[in-house]
């Protein structure tokens, strides 16, 4: 069994898998586990200690040592960390491939393996990323503030606007300050994504490319999805598995 970690800025997804198709998933706050010993105690509650390897996709480099120490101390193994430069089945057509976030790398890998050589991926996390895959070449992407980042910016940058909890709305105009913020944030982000995708389709001749939405925050906008959009919450986990498959061969 492989032990996979998808370490995000806010939450970490932990998954156990044998084949990269089905996953036994747990989720924790990223900064709730501070040491390799705490990680061991947490995992022991749910999993047997029979891991073939440990593979980590992390966008929080200052806690990577926890996974390194855990693998060495409790598994007598070296943790494997996702990076674009280690994966050779995709051409990383950007200035500095080593700077591509691991979360983006695994999204692109899984999109390529599961949906074809052309794809557009939108990952709704703390920040929202849009990835462009053209003929199995990663052409780059876009990063925009996530839902909660925009809410927090309004709250911290003004004297009176409240911090609200986001939820879908069936109207485009709010009747109170809270609904004004909710509608404004969600519609601004969705409108920006729609515009960006249309430009990408036109500029890169990707009019028939599949569009995949993923990431924990995508649940907020699931009911707004157009019929041609694919909703795939396990895209990143499969990407981690495919990365391991590639480098283990």
Swiss-Prot record:
Residues engaged in binding substrate: 101-104, 177
Textual note on the cofactor: A monovalent cation. Ammonium or potassium.
GO biological process: coenzyme A biosynthetic process
Record keywords: ATP-binding, Coenzyme A biosynthesis, Cytoplasm, Kinase, Metal-binding, Nucleotide-binding, Potassium, Transferase
GO CC annotation: cytoplasm
InterPro entries hit by this protein: ATPase_NBD, Type_III_PanK
Any matching Pfam family: Pan_kinase
Keyword check for Cytoplasm: yes
Catalysed transformations (reactions): (R)-pantothenate + ATP = (R)-4'-phosphopantothenate + ADP + H(+)
Entry EC no(s): 2.7.1.33
Cofactors: NH4(+); K(+)
Binding site for K(+): 123
Positions with a binding annotation for ATP: 6-13, 126
Subunit record text: Homodimer.
Entry similarity comment: Belongs to the type III pantothenate kinase family.
Protein name per Swiss-Prot or TrEMBL: Type III pantothenate kinase
Organism: Thermosipho africanus (strain TCF52B)
Name of encoding gene: coaX
